[in-house]
């Protein structure tokens, strides 16, 4: 019978002793002597390798198999033999072996001491390392868990457009589409989208609960370990839900996806804990078990100011109401002050987007950021402004192009009672759950300023 390596180790493999199995896999290593050789095999189904023992008196092509290089593709037929006193609990006694495709001698990963930067420059090969195998397995589980949560809670998935005629965030950091045959292809200046939120609001007013989950683009000339030019966003939008209700949904979603990884990817997490953060699994379990605190922005400013007075040093020690909190301030709130996930809420309107609902104090908006230890901001969301006149006034104050946003304004004219939504940078979520330090290591082929290979 043909099996995956994961299938062998995930079952009671003692019952497999003496059984004949077929494996198709890649060679991780191959060592031999005159009479016996040892292949270490991996087929991508697990971080666990399978050792296959081949002998000169058992196979007719012994010399050919001794030449199988690292990452050669092979087909092996053999008998399972238990090895309880050895490092591995079982091995495969080879009866037949075939090299399906040899690997060239200059295979990069033959060098086991490669830096993360070298692997980023060779992103087509890095999934063959244990590190990126583990990261991408966790990423896949997180993505599935997002869709699972949304499906269980009756959200409809929306395929938001990637071309847009407006900058929804108002930050101006968009990629512009070049003219086609010396004319605007869409009849006006067009950009790659930075968010699917505006379109999600339109559908939420018909479906109730919707979400987008797809790529977004931001033209930031940043070379930090926290920024990408192309990244994925999870953006749910809910009609008839206020800020508090939205925070409850955020908390439930974050706990659901982390719990899914804890249940499905224990092997990968144990490897990543050894590689990145020895407390990784405890950290994730703490998030699942904790209650997310909620703190007013104005109170956070007081807490930070008191920290400075008590001798704590930030790079930016000038703390005042109206400031846009930096990553160091956010991390202080969730790592030092609260020591757990915390929602900051009701930010000053001047540092938030135009579409957020103005509070009764006329100074703040019904917005929230979820701060997570080790990352800082992971989720940003708000209750949307439902009053047509207030939204129009805010657009005018910010000198935004009313004509291209008129359809969005018009939603408020037709039963738009209440809507709230949030965005999660998917790669930042992967960073947190895997413990990696650079966001470029959380996406298969990273795109950032000056980098467009592959």
UniProtKB/Swiss-Prot annotation:
**What GO annotations for molecular function exist for this entry?**
asparagine-tRNA ligase activity; ATP binding; nucleic acid binding
Q: Which residues cross the membrane?
A: none
EC number(s) from the headed UniProt entry: 6.1.1.22
Example GO CC term: the record gives: cytoplasm
Q: What is its main location?
A: cytoplasm
What CDD domains does its record include? AsxRS_core (cd00776), EcAsnRS_like_N (cd04318)
Q: Which GO terms describe its biological process?
A: asparaginyl-tRNA aminoacylation
This protein's assembly is summarised as: Homodimer.
Q: What HAMAP family does this protein's entry cite? A: Asn_tRNA_synth
Q: Which family does it belong to?
A: Belongs to the class-II aminoacyl-tRNA synthetase family.
Query: What name has this protein been given in UniProt?
Result: Asparagine--tRNA ligase
Organism encoding this protein: Ureaplasma urealyticum serovar 10 (strain ATCC 33699 / Western)
Q: What gene is it encoded by?
A: asnS
